[in-house]
């Protein structure tokens, strides 16, 4: 492995910690890979090496994922596997999660390599190396080491399901490994009289993902939103999973016969695509209070996986406008945060935006020891004595041109600069004004920080004076967060349009030299002061006038017309964008009537809180700086502006709740489902405020409390002892019946929950498959010679001889220290017991399709039968006539000589 890493110019290392039960796959998130902004042809070649240990012998599996095209495809399967088994390519997936992050997923119950007999139980995963070669030929590497060896135990997983779970017509959608679903449910008591606990299980295609509430339960449900964290089995994503329980009934108005209505939103992750679109989400919840007896309930929802491209993979970008005179212009690139005067490994690249030829447009690459790159036209560069890098461009012509510059230091920390060069008109006497700083604080990390997995974005401080802004000038504060700081939540900016804007001349007719104001130009310039980096023989600059209207531009200030998204905007359907061009601004409480429509001519769609993340064809929300604002535009002045902040720092409609930790909780809202499988309903009609996160789908920031330490042991989850006064010994899914974990409840079996199309589920409902359960369950199982039935039973088509054992035997887990023997524990978990009141779901009864009628009447069928008989009779007559004719011919013929076959006997 060490020899292989020598080819890497930049290497990131991480330690992977797998805990809990084995869900049938393992997932490794790999952040901080560079995807260059403003470039639709910037691809990357990716190869992965997986290092195994087989009984003390090293084994290497090489996977070729080919070329990644982040603008057109998000999920990749290996094109080839070298050193692996015959079906190894079917056991791996590589997925783009947005913000430069990849996720490698591998099945854990099937061996991807060939081993000899007796070695099946000795295969452990040691490390993963990812090789990422960008369009400039730079090799970026990520080495992920397993904190403890992960043993792969090959086994067949039986088909598992849960009986008597109320079905819903709501579909749970998975985007970029994050599931998002909002379900209606009912509890017997009002909010302040209830507690609440929830567990989920996702089953399909030999994958079994379980998620439980971290704190066990919500001890008291409050009016409004009740937020909580959940933990899922297997790999723990750096973006936490969570949920929100919201009371939707008035305090004193229960639903007759069912109780009080609530809305439950769940966002577990990671959810592997290996589940498939036929998988099912089971939600088991419990809630009760001192005034009423509670119970355990179960509802289920179908799962579909979206092929939608996640939010931009592009690196965050600082934007700078430069207006120059003459033939040349220069921009100075400062050092990155991790760089010092002795850093040996520094790389600078440059390319013109929107190239169309990968063979010729990516030749401008410099290092500390390299000379002038071959094939780099109209661009030259050199390191100065203070380690800044000066780039000089020439021969640009009169039209503005955009140059993308990146600078990377030793530990792969990268800053990206978007510089727009505009040539001043020949008639003016304005001296060249260059902004060569690009940053307000050189010690601030910009681009891709090495100390955090959360993607960096650019922020602008709130102004304390009059609001005077343009679409292309924001705070000079650069993007990024320092090591250990709280991650910044990216939010699409109304100004990010992705188009290049021109900087017209704004010279006053009464002054030889005019420096434009940020937002408007006075018709008669008065006495003014000079701007930085600009020389003027006459001190004449118009003072900023908020909301003033320019007589030349004829457009109002952005501060007078910008409409920001409101938090109460409700979108019952996802992905609606305006069919018109320019800018679409969401109005308060706007409702989008159409599912999945996108406009091919829309320049920018300002997302509502219920539909976040750009659709296919949209430009990056991180790095697309333009001169367009909502409600009117003000073109960029001729002089240099400060570096543009690509992301607005003020996002209306978001709610931030923090506690004692800096890690943010991602509850991903729904996004545009253009490529979703058809479903009967959409689940984006929740009335709760939507959430933002560092990932593309957004969501409200909820800072979770980070535990002091993570246990490396694999302790089986189990259900608690029953409450006093209860008699049922059934336990929850995947749990034994001996635990006393707080928040988990068991109650007496009673009335089953309400089905989707019937008032009440019948007792002992059976599944369509032969059912055999472990002793913990009671659905169609034989225990001690007694046949019993019950609700919530989990059933399987596999015999108990293969997966027998009692319910207290732990399931297979990631083993950190010893080899795992072949599993004999039951894969059929105890059922989930139900009691009243029944669950009601907001679903319509599926209508029974009408019985199809015959296409022909009896008379028509009779005519067809007689016609067929006539045809057959005619054919028979023709055959008989032909035979008679041939018989007549044969009888009239006489031989004059013997037959030829006996000719030798006649001489």
Curated annotation (Swiss-Prot):
| Biased amino acid composition, Low complexity | 428-437, 507-612, 659-671, 782-792
Q: Which residues are glycosylated?
A: 47, 87, 114, 166, 169, 195, 229, 277, 318, 328, 345, 356, 378, 386, 411, 435, 443, 457, 497, 519, 533, 547, 568, 589, 610, 624, 627, 645, 656, 683, 701, 735, 746, 755, 780, 815, 858
Residue spans making up a coiled coil are none
Q: Which residues lie on this side of the membrane: Virion surface?
A: 1-860
* Membrane topology qualifier: Single-pass membrane protein
Result after altering residue 210 to A: 60% loss of interaction with host CR2
- Topological region Intravirion: 882-907
One Pfam family from the UniProt entry? HV_Gp350_C-term
* Superkingdom assignment: Viruses
Q: Output the GO biological process annotations, alphabetical, semicolon-separated.
A: symbiont entry into host cell
Biased composition annotated in UniProt, kind: Polar residues = 442-500, 617-658, 672-687, 700-741, 748-781, 794-827
Biotechnology remark: Primary surface antigen capable of inducing and reacting with virus-neutralizing antibodies. Almost all EBV candidate vaccines are based on gp350 proteins.
Protein modification: Extensively glycosylated.
Provide this UniProt record's keywords sorted from A to Z: Glycoprotein, Host membrane, Host-virus interaction, Late protein, Membrane, Transmembrane, Transmembrane helix, Virion
- Annotated effect of mutating residue 162 to A: Complete loss of interaction with host CR2
Under the cellular component aspect of Gene Ontology, which terms does the record hold? Answer: host cell membrane; membrane; virion membrane
Q: Where is this region: Disordered?
A: 423-830
List residues traversing the bilayer: 861-881
Impact of altering residue 201 to A?
30% loss of interaction with host CR2
Q: Which GO terms describe its molecular function?
A: receptor ligand activity
Compartment(s) of residence: Virion membrane; Host membrane
Q: What is the effect of changing residue 208 to A?
A: 60% loss of interaction with host CR2
Biological role = Initiates virion attachment to host B-lymphocyte cell, leading to virus entry. Acts by binding to host CR2 at the surface of B-lymphocytes, facilitating the binding of viral glycoprotein gp42 to HLA class II molecules. Attachment triggers virion-host membrane fusion and invasion of the host cell.
On subunit structure and binding partners, the annotation says: Interacts with host CR2.
Family affiliation? Belongs to the Epstein-Barr GP350 family.
What name goes with this protein? Answer: Envelope glycoprotein GP350
Q: Which source organism does the UniProt entry give?
A: Epstein-Barr virus (strain B95-8)
């Amino acid at each position: 492995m060490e020899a292989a890493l020598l080819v890497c110019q930049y290497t990131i290392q991480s330690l992977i910690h797998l805990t809990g039960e084995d869900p049938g796959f393992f997932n490794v998130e790999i952040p901080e890979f560079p995807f260059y902004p403003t470039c639709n042809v910037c691809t990357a070649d990716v190869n992965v090496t997986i290092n195994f240990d087989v009984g003390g012998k090293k084994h290497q599996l090489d996977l070729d994922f080919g070329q990644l095209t982040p603008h057109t495809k998000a999920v990749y399967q290996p094109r080839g596997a070298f050193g692996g088994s015959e079906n190894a390519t079917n056991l791996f997936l590589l997925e783009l999660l947005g913000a430069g992050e990849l996720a490698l997923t591998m099945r854990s119950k099937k061996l991807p390599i060939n081993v000899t007999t007796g070695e099946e139980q000795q295969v452990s995963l040691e490390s993963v190396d990812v090789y990422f070669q960008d369009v400039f030929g730079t090799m970026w590497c990520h080495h992920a080491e397993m904190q403890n060896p992960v043993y792969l135990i090959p086994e067949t997983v039986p088909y598992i399901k849960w009986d008597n779970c109320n079905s819903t017509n709501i579909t749970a959608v998975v985007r970029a490994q994050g599931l998002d679903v909002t379900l209606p449910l009912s509890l017997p008591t009002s909010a302040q009289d209830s507690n609440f606990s929830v567990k989920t299980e996702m089953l399909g295609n030999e994958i079994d993902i379980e998620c439980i509430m971290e704190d066990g339960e919500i001890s008291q449900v409050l009016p409004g939103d009740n937020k909580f964290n959940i933990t899922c089995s297997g790999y723990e994503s750096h973006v936490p999973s969570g949920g929100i329980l919201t009371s939707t009934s008035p305090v004193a108005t229960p639903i007759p016969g069912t109780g009080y209505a609530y809305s439950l939103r769940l966002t577990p992750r990671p959810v592997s695509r290996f589940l498939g679109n036929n998988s099912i989400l089971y939600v088991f919840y419990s809630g009760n209070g001192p005034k009423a007896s509670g119970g355990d309930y179960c509802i289920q929802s179908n799962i579909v996986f979206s092929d939608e491209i996640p939010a931009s993979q592009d690196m965050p970008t600082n934007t700078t406008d430069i207006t120059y005179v003459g033939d040349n212009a220069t921009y100075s690139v400062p050092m990155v945060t991790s760089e010092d005067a002795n850093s040996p490994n520094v790389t600078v690249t440059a390319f013109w935006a929107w190239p169309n030829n990968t063979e010729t447009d990516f030749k401008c690459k410099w290092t500390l020891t390299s000379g002038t790159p071959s094939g780099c036209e109209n661009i030259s560069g050199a390191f100065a004595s203070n380690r800044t890098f000066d780039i000089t461009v020439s021969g640009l012509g009169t039209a503005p041109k955009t140059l993308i510059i990146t600078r990377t230091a030793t530990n792969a920390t990268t800053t990206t600069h978007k510089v727009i060069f505009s040539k001043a008109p020949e008639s003016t006497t304005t001296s060249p004004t260059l902004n060569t700083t690009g940053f307000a604080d050189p010690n601030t990390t910009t681009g891709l920080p090495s100390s955090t997995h959360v993607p960096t974005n650019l922020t602008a401080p709130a102004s304390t004076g009059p609001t005077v802004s343009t679409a292309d000038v924001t705070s000079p504060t650069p993007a990024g967060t320092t090591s250990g700081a709280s991650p910044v939540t990216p939010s699409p900016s109304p100004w990010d349009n992705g188009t290049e804007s021109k900087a017209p001349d704004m010279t006053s007719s009464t002054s030889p030299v005019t420096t434009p104001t940020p937002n408007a130009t006075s018709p008669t310039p008065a006495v003014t002061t000079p701007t930085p980096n600009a020389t003027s023989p006459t001190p004449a600059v118009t003072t900023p006038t908020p909301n003033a209207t320019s007589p030349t531009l004829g457009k109002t200030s952005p501060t007078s017309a910008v409409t920001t998204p409101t938090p109460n905007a409700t979108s019952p359907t996802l992905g609606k964008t305006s069919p018109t061009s320019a800018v679409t601004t969401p109005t308060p409480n706007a409702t989008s009537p159409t599912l999945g429509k996108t406009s091919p001519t829309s320049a920018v769609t300002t997302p509502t809180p219920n539909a976040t993340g750009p659709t296919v064809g949209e430009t990056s929300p991180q790095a697309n700086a333009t001169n367009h604002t909502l409600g009117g535009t003000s073109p960029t002045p001729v002089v240099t502006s400060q570096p543009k902040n690509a992301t607005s720092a003020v996002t209306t409609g978001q709610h931030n709740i923090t506690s004692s930790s800096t890690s943010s909780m991602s509850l991903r809202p729904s996004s545009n489902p253009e490529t979703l499988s058809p479903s009967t309903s959409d689940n984006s009609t929740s009335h709760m405020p939507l959430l933002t996160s560092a990932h593309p789908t957004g969501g409200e920031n909820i800072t979770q409390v980070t535990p002091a330490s993570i246990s490396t042991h694999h302790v089986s989850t189990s259900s608690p002892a029953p409450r006093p006064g209860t008699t049922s010994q059934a336990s929850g899914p995947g749990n034994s019946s001996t635990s006393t974990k707080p928040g988990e409840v068991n109650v007496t079996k009673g009335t089953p929950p309400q089905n989707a199309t019937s008032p009440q589920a019948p007792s002992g409902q059976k599944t369509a498959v032969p059912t055999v359960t472990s002793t913990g369950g009671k659905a169609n199982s034989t225990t001690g010679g007694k046949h019993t039935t019950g609700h919530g039973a989990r059933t399987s088509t596999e015999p108990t001889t293969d997966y027998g054992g009692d319910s207290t035997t732990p399931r297979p887990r990631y083993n950190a220290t010893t080899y795992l023997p072949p599993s004999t524990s039951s894969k059929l978990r105890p059922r989930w017991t139900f009691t009243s009141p029944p669950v009601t779901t907001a679903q319509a009864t599926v209508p029974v399709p009408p019985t199809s009628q015959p296409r022909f009447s009896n008379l028509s069928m009779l005519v067809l039968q007689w016609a067929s008989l006539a045809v057959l009779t005619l054919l028979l007559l023709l055959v008989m006539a032909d035979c008679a004719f041939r018989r007549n011919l044969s009888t009239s013929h006489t031989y004059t000589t013997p037959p030829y076959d006996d000719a030798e006997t006649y001489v």
